[in-house]
């Protein structure tokens, strides 16, 4: 259905809308209109403010409609849009004009459910306090205040790749009952501010929301140009690579049963990626040092004025966060202390789903690993890159750009040997 624009002067305040004076263009059916509350989420970055407003609006829209009994092909092509023209609102709260689009809302709603993430918890984790910027290998990378979700800014090409593979991904998640090392994709959005489009993917954080990671590796099983740069190595938590792992004689210490389960899961996931002709993925490996982890860390101040959030969509948010994350009874990580006290290096597996306990007596307290960068398909560009690298390094070199089947075999061989 085509979107239609309503002049700002005559537009009523839509359900979840920011208030009088807004014009909306929406693919969704007409909703019951309500007046907005006074407080509005304040974010220093307009893009982040609009993104969080849009997520709250979207979750509220979904909450008005029961989930479908089954997903249909059209659900994988659907989208929900809203266009806001606001001439009576102050720019320190939200921009005067913006657009927000959610891709395949019913599909991602279903995926969140299969990953045991409640929509209200998803909303609280994303919007109770502003997400913080963190270092990413490429593009913008944000992490939710409770450290359970990551928000990655991606390209329009990545969105197209996600669209083309979403049905296969969903079928695989259904088949494996959500028990996978693949990224848990939870939402896909477009935010338009000042006529500039930004694309956001929301995923579950692969690292612990409670335990800090002290060493981090990005492993592909390739050895050519797979060493962290000097610039990277001086960072507080550098992303090290395959050659760094070998040069440091790093090993992963987990029990035999945990190793068996992990490798079986990894092999199954990689076989799925080969079927989709996907390559260039990595194993993201994070290691928590139990000795360093027991040292007290300073808590940063909480900016209460930036923690105010009424939901903007007739969803009254929880009170402002006080203290460190992980103490709230709401949000994805909110129940961490409600079952039992956690000792040094311990975690709740239903929250830190990518975690594996280290073997008894191991120098590390916990290991976190999952597959990342799974959107690269072996297309004409990759074929050309493979040919160029083969000429430069020779046919036998361990370059990263190879056929998907060859990439998978080399990757699995390398990962199988990282354990003590």
UniProtKB/Swiss-Prot annotation:
GO BP annotations listed: 1-phosphatidyl-1D-myo-inositol 4,5-bisphosphate biosynthetic process; negative regulation of insulin receptor signaling pathway; phosphatidylinositol biosynthetic process; phosphatidylinositol phosphate biosynthetic process; positive regulation of autophagosome assembly; regulation of autophagy
Cell compartments where the protein resides: Endoplasmic reticulum; Cytoplasm
Location, primary (coarse class): endoplasmic reticulum
InterPro entries, per database record: PInositol-4-P-4/5-kinase_C_sf, PInositol-4-P-4/5-kinase_core, PInositol-4-P-5-kinase_N, PInositol-4/5-P-5/4-kinase
Ranges in a coiled coil: none
Residues bearing PTM N-acetylalanine: 2
Tissue expression notes: Widely expressed, with the most abundant expression in kidney.
Free-text function comment from the UniProt entry: Phosphatidylinositol 5-phosphate 4-kinase with low enzymatic activity. May be a GTP sensor, has higher GTP-dependent kinase activity than ATP-dependent kinase activity. PIP4Ks negatively regulate insulin signaling through a catalytic-independent mechanism. They interact with PIP5Ks and suppress PIP5K-mediated PtdIns(4,5)P2 synthesis and insulin-dependent conversion to PtdIns(3,4,5)P3.
Name recorded for this polypeptide: Phosphatidylinositol 5-phosphate 4-kinase type-2 gamma
Protein's gene: Pip4k2c
């Amino acid at each position: 259905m085509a979107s239609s624009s309503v002049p700002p002067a005559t537009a009523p305040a839509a359900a979840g809308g920011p208030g009088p004076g807004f014009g909306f263009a929406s693919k969704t059916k007409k909703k019951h209109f309500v007046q907005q509350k006074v407080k509005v989420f304040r974010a220093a970055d307009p893009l982040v403010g609009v993104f969080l407003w849009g997520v709250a609006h979207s979750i509220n829209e979904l909450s008005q409609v029961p989930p479908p009994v089954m997903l249909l092909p059209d659900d994988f092509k659907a989208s929900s849009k809203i266009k806001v023209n606001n001439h009576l609102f102050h720019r320190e709260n939200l921009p005067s004009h913006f657009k927000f689009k959610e891709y395949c809302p019913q599909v991602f709603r279903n995926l969140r459910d299969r990953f045991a993430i409640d929509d209200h918890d998803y909303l609280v984790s994303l919007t109770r306090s502003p997400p913080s910027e963190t270092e990413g290998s490429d593009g913008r990378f944000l992490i939710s205040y409770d450290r359970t979700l990551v928000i990655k800014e991606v390209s329009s090409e990545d969105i197209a790749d996600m669209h083309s593979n979403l049905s296969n991904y969903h079928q695989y998640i259904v088949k494996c009952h959500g028990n996978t090392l693949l990224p848990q994709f939870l939402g896909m959005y477009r935010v338009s501010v000042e006529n500039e489009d930004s694309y956001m993917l929301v995923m579950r954080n692969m690292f612990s929301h409670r335990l800090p990671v002290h060493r981090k590796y990005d492993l592909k099983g390739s050895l050519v140009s797979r060493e962290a740069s000097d610039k990277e190595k001086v960072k507080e938590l550098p992303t090290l690579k395959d050659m760094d792992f070998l040069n440091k004689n790093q090993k992963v210490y987990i029990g035999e049963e945990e190793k068996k389960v992990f490798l079986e899961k990894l092999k199954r996931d990689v076989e799925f990626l080969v079927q989709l002709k996907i390559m260039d993925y990595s194993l993201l490996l994070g290691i928590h040092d139990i000795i360093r982890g027991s040292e007290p860390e300073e808590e940063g101040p909480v900016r209460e004025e930036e923690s105010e959030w009424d939901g903007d969509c007739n969803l009254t948010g929880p009170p402002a966060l006080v203290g460190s994350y992980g103490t709230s009874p709401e949000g994805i990580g909110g129940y961490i202390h409600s079952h039992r006290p956690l000792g040094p290096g311990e975690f709740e597996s239903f929250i830190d789903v990518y975690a594996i306990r280290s073997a008894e007596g191991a120098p590390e307290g916990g290991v976190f690993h999952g597959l990342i960068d799974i959107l690269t398909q072996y297309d004409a560009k990759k074929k050309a890159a493979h040919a160029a690298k083969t000429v430069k390094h020779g046919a036998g070199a361990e370059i990263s750009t190879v056929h998907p089947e060859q990439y998978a075999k080399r990757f699995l061989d390398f990962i199988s040997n990282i354990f003590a």
